[in-house]
């Protein structure tokens, strides 16, 4: 019998990643026995592994997160290559966030949203309430000063939020989650990058067929040619993958 409340770990470049079989497995893992886990979720793709390799501070932030999972198809393929018996599938961060929000709405779990432009954040809140009746207990757009961080942490703590999602891009969101947990430790934190923009339709995500083929990165590159410099970095990751240096 499969235990959906547990998940194996697979190490890439010294970082242990959770191997979820699918979205259902991920949700059952995070809500094991009806209790939402506490800690930090970090989506891992090839670009983030490269950054962690070159930036000790980013690596420390990622290493400290309890729940590191394979968000990028290249990472999933590397796990399968290194561990042939691994039953792991890609769980995209944007999809996991939506699934968490739907589950939170069903369970009445209090949610605090951080990040994004004011108008995008407002639209995100409205859509979450309408679509899944999410219990949003507070929010803060991404435009606040370093001096206002402690006040934000106090608000999050006072709200009693059990899920805190932060859309500020990496590594800003990981830094904020790390510091906020010192004030409000009993919650599940999730860095979500540009997910609010996608959720509200301000940014178009790759069509499903591109996602299913593992070509979402190519769709983004064709849509945003300026990403070519970032994509060129991935040649280094490909070398790791094909030489078994993971």
UniProtKB/Swiss-Prot annotation:
Top-level taxonomic group: Bacteria
Record bears the keyword Transmembrane: no
Recorded name of the encoding gene: wecG
Biological function: Catalyzes the synthesis of Und-PP-GlcNAc-ManNAcA (Lipid II), the second lipid-linked intermediate involved in enterobacterial common antigen (ECA) synthesis.
Family: Belongs to the glycosyltransferase 26 family.
Span of the signal peptide: none
Organism encoding this protein: Salmonella typhimurium (strain LT2 / SGSC1412 / ATCC 700720)
Catalytic reaction(s) noted: UDP-N-acetyl-alpha-D-mannosaminouronate + N-acetyl-alpha-D-glucosaminyl-di-trans,octa-cis-undecaprenyl diphosphate = beta-D-ManNAcA-(1->4)-alpha-D-GlcNAc-di-trans,octa-cis-undecaprenyl diphosphate + UDP + H(+)
One Pfam family this sequence matches: Glyco_tran_WecG
HAMAP family per UniProt: WecG_RffM
UniProt GO molecular function: hexosyltransferase activity; lipopolysaccharide N-acetylmannosaminouronosyltransferase activity
Pathway: Bacterial outer membrane biogenesis; enterobacterial common antigen biosynthesis
Keyword set, alphabetical order: Glycosyltransferase, Transferase
Group of enzyme by EC: transferase
Protein name (Swiss-Prot/TrEMBL): UDP-N-acetyl-D-mannosaminuronic acid transferase
InterPro entries listed in its UniProt record: UDP-ManNAcA_Trfase_WecG, WecG_TagA_CpsF
Enzyme nomenclature, EC number: 2.4.1.180
Biological processes annotated in GO: enterobacterial common antigen biosynthetic process
């Amino acid at each position: 019998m499969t235990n959906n409340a547990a998940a194996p770990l697979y190490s890439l470049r010294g970082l242990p990643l959770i191997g979820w079989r699918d979205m259902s497995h991920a949700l059952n893992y995070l809500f094991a026995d009806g209790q939402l886990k506490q800690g930090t979720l970090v989506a891992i793709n090839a670009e983030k592994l490269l950054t962690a390799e070159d930036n000790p501070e980013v690596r420390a932030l990622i290493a400290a997160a309890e729940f590191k999972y394979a968000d990028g198809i290249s990472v999933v393929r590397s796990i399968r290559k290194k561990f042939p018996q691994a039953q792991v599938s890609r769980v995209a961060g944007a999809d996991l966030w939506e699934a968490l929000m739907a589950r939170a709405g069903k369970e009445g779990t209090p949610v605090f949203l951080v990040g994004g432009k004011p108008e995008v954040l407002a639209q995100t809140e409205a859509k979450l309430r309408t679509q899944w009746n999410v219990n949003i207990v507070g929010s803060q757009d991404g435009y606040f000063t370093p001096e206002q961080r402690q006040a934000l942490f106090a608000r999050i703590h006072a709200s009693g939020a059990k899920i805190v999602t932060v859309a500020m891009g990496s590594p800003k969101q990981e830094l904020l989650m790390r510091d906020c947990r010192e004030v409000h430790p009993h919650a599940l934190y999730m860095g979500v990058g540009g997910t609010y923009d996608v959720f509200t339709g301000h940014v178009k995500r790759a069509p499903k067929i591109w996602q299913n083929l593992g070509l979402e990165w190519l769709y983004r590159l064709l849509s945003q040619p300026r990403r070519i410099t970032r994509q060129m970095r991935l040649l280094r990751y490909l070398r790791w993958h094909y030489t078994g240096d993971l």
